[in-house]
Amino acid sequence: MIDLHVHSTYSDGTFTVQELVDYALEKGLSAIALTDHDTVDGLDEIMEYAKGKPIEVIPGIEFSTEYEGKDVHIVGLYIDYKCETFKTWLRDFVDSRVTRNKKICIKLTEHGCPVDYDELVKRYPGAVITRAHFAAFLMEKGYVKSREEAFDRYIGDNAPCFLPREKVTPKDAIRIISEAGGISILAHPVLYKMSDARLDKLVRELADEGLIGIEALYSTYTAGDVRHIKSLANQYNLLISGGSDFHGANKPKIDLGTGHGSLEIPDEILTELKKCLAYYVFSDMDGTLFDEKCVFSDALKDSIRGFVERGNVLVPTTGRPYKGTINAFIENDMVLPDMKVICSNGALIIDVETETPVIEFKLTSEEIREVIKKADELGIYVHSYDDDNIVLREETEETRFYTRKVHMPLKFVEDIADELKDGALKLMCIDLNNKPKLEAFRTWIHENMGDRLQGIFSNDRYMEVLSVKAGKGNGIKAFCKLNHIPIGRTYACGDQENDIDMIKAAGCGVAVANATAEAKAAADVITKDDASHDALKPLFDSI
């Protein structure tokens, strides 16, 4: 059994982190997550104390957020709490809490209960001061006789000394948890006392923002509550989490691991959540992963296979159509287990084993016709694709140049739009000598069809026309949402303009040494070597 929602004296719990570990061992738990309110101060201590003991301690946090005027809590599990971005964001957030607590001290003093802020902090060293601490302090000073009286007379939501906390939105919390490589969980949704419709709206919106899981097992839930939350999880593709919300003496009826006595959180829940912890490399192919001959070196093959064997995932993310993508991996004997690819510049995500589209964004037949009509006026070559072929009207110099690297059969038709009545993932526009002409064509597309279509350069000769919903960056976001991947566990690697949005979308954007200046400017890291010299080998070796 496990418990993925536990508090210590570093926030409003009464057990020290060492006492928590010892008690969890006494109760036979295999794992606990320390999720103190808005602080990670206890994590170093608890991780160190748990070393060598037969229990896993998961680094976590519980963020207090606000949604439409209501407190909503977001738990983060497996966060990289030493990540500089996370530390800076949390420090700024905590500083705002300190300011608020000092103002509450002034208000209490004005209402006849003198409270010195420095004395309060010394009384609870290392803790994030909450109203629970204020209530206990007021009792110690003899200003009130009970916690309830402290809230009713002074610090409750409608009491004279109350000040609202500096809050973030659930979206903010999900984003910062994801950027820190963590798993975001909507905590105890039943406690928010929302109507079914409003709770459904909350869960739907947070799932759209990248929420990974929901607390479906909790100390106070009824069997009906569990069924309801599991149904929401299934509806919105969320993983299940569970926790007691143990606080020690501050919630005396709730015990670690078992809540009110009947709570059971099986290890299998953690097994599923841990599947989110793999690292993903989304890599462009031509000019990034491949050399000029579209061949993997043996050394790069070994690095990629080792990366995958360690539980990580390579997702080819390319402008190529699917057949042109998978054929290149077949020719290199590099088809990987459970492989998925993002192709046609993010217009298609496909499962290689089943060849089943997971997500696709198509141009309509009417849009194809309109684009080709304008291309013909400008004297620009255009072809498209069906599932297996390059669809074109005639073979030209541009066709021969394109098929040097993309090995697919040619299907000749009189009218491309008529042939592709169900639409197409993209149109490929080629001019081998006149990029300004392609740029002018792209401008026309954006001015006349920009609400539906976009033009993206994959190199100086190729301009691809896609749905505005496509693009490699959007492809990565959709892939991560579908597969419960924290952005902080993603890398995106590229070299050209059509790679820039994915370089920006990933947790770490990588430009290879031969990339354009614009791609390098968008990246967090620039490789030492170019694509012809195994640019990404050090990345695969390091993860």
Predicted regions mapped to residue ranges:
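An N-terminally biased module of ancient metal coordination in phosphate/nucleic-acid-related enzymes
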Residues: 1-70, 154-156, 168-175, 180-235, ...
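Non-catalytic pre-domain segments flanking phosphatase-related domains
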Residues: 275-285, 302-305, 309
